[in-house]
């Protein structure tokens, strides 16, 4: 399939925000969909690619203040598909990584509505690429763990990790929140050494990217940028602390992104 089909819901990953990091499949669906239901974190640069006759609606939720309930999102998807429209449910990053896609898939199945999941570049992979550092390493990081600092309603007091964290793991915390001190305490309880590198990166792989780095013993007082933020922890991040991945090198990557987004004629 090259374009969208009527009566189908497409759960599409928008990637980290740079339109050039969209998949070809995602772009074709945006150009042909009748209805686009998007999260708040999907930037205007991506929404600008939507067909001009499509109905575009924000259904995002931020800081616990939903514009629409999850059940309401389900209803919009199902009603639009049953009306014979092609529907793109556009999510930041990858739909299947902390994107509540499981709930939406269950609702579509229960309603006997056809759907397709279109993967996107998740923020963790975008962050590693933007920083020029691999998330895994043959010698120091043979495991990669994704977790979230934002749990289901009423469970935000739960620790990000239970038990001992493997020494050879890179931990990626999605939505860590502002209280990095709490996370630092939980990492210590999980057996993470004080000299392990930590990097908080905001708006990874976009023109708004910023990042700060410290060892675990400095994480308590570290201030990260505006949401969305990722916290990366592990020996694989040591190059940032040691200066192997310089801030100047990172700025070059961001400047190139800025040229692509601001100037359509840039090579």
Model-derived regions, located:
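Short, acidic/turn-prone active-site loops that include or flank metal/cofactor-
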Residues: 16, 41-43, 59-66, 121-123, ...
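Class I S-adenosyl-L-methionine
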Residues: 1-19, 24-118, 218-226
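Phosphate- and divalent-cation-binding pockets in alpha/beta enzyme and binding domains
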Residues: 45-46, 99, 125-126, 182-183
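Class I SAM-dependent methyltransferase SAM-binding "motif I" and its flanking Rossmann-like core
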Residues: 94-167, 210-213
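Catalytic-loop motifs flanking and including active-site residues across diverse enzymes
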Residues: 73, 119, 123, 179
